[in-house]
Amino acid sequence: MKGRVLVTGGLGYIGSHTAVELLAQGYEVLLVDNLSNTRASVLDGIEAISGKRPEWLQIDLADPAACRSALEGQHLDGIIHFAAYKAVGESVQEPLKYYQNNLGSLMNLLDYVSQHPSCGFIFSSSCTVYGQADQLPITEDAPVKAAESPYGNTKQIGEEIIREVAVARGLRTIALRYFNPIGAHASARIGELPLGVPQNLVPFMTQSAAGLRGPLSVYGNDYPTEDGTAVRDYIHVVDLAQAHIMALERLLAQQNEEALEVFNLGTGKGSSVLEVIHAFERATGASLSWDFAPRRAGDITAAYADTQRASAVLGWTAKKSLDESMRDAWAWQMALG
């Protein structure tokens, strides 16, 4: 066994795929998830893929007493912290809920790590910290701009809290700034499982093509891009999960050069909404109904990653294509029925 790793939000989209990769690499995995944005059945999918059923605790990490009780005596080598509320629109309506949950859970976990400084800590951050960057592709040194939402602000503030605590307590920590995760495990046993109306492009697209939703709305066709639609960096969730393993290995080997290291995770290539639609139809043979709608407030024109630091330092690069991501997302949708 390589080590014992806690994955918070471990039954969520990225957390479940990371748990599968950890198990495949020989780690012992402990999952924590309060099921606020997923279902317990994801555990069955993890077991079906890996042949192992990791321990799962259903607790609220934002509750200091519950968090302390759950982690007491766990002897963790690493924590990968995904658990967070993540709906941008809801965060604008209910900012206090987002600050209490996202920052409360983070601080409770850091309290544990501060008492166990040999435990590496990986934070699920986001490219939202950059806003509309002045230059593309976006490097990790690009200025962090005022957040567009309380959700985005919890990622910015979260990074600062981690940095200050890590410096003060001599901790080893990494923040991974994701671009746009898509796709699903090739087995179609786990994938993105939005409760209610999907907030992200690809699950809405697959549900629409499956006849579960009406036509897809493409928000904005007047952006200063080649086809007028917004451009993002779409990365396969399995590539993303594997980056967490490489980041964890860096921390466990005590190779980090700063108390908090930051890495972008993306493909380095931007794709417009229309390009994603065309890739979906090309890769799956399914047809999609869509129409243009006005831009959404807060949406930026374009964002895609400079991934040189992750490549040079972690030895990680995204391998899966947009078409492969579309095929896997569609297979997952078909498996859901």
Regions of interest found by a model, annotated:
Residues 1-184:
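N-terminal Rossmann-like NAD(P)+-binding domain of SDR-like oxidoreductases, especially those catalyzing
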Residues 9, 57, 69, 81, ...:
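Short, flexible active-site loop motifs that bind/organize anionic cofactors or intermediates
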Residues 13, 149, 177, 192, ...:
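Amphipathic alpha-helical recognition patches that constitute DNA-binding helices
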Residues 93, 101, 145, 168, ...:
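A generic fold-level signal
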Residues 99, 148-156, 191, 195-199, ...:
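Short-chain dehydrogenase/reductase
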Residues 114, 192-197, 298, 317:
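A general boundary/transition motif marking the beginning of the first structured unit of a protein
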Residues 201-337:
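C-terminal substrate-binding subdomain of Rossmann-fold SDR/epimerase-dehydratase oxidoreductases
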